[in-house]
Amino acid sequence: MVNSANMKHSETDQVSLELGRRVAERLRWQPELVAFALANLARWSRQNIAAPSLLRCYAEWQIILSRPVDEICDLLCAATEDAQRLRQNSPFAGVLAPAEVWAVKSRFRHAPATA
């Protein structure tokens, strides 16, 4: 098994981007996943009521999720610092099967280093 804690920051960013792309691919065909993401945000907001930084992130995602699906998908696939920051707390957790997530992590963890 691949442990995310042992991954380099650049590997974590690559994994996050690939997972975002895979979620976006599903979201284009299953726009109802926006409701799933909103439910995650509602639950997380209740669970993390004493964490203002997380609540700000969740509020930002709520605004994003009110946009058209294509715009949400563009953000999930963007290689920008802002998109990377947002993907760190993606409300789409649970959309991808654990085996798929681990396969992506494993692929990047064991990929040859590029300079």
Regions found by a protein language model. Name each.
Residues 2-115:
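Basic, alpha-helical nucleic-acid-binding regions used in initiation and control of genome expression
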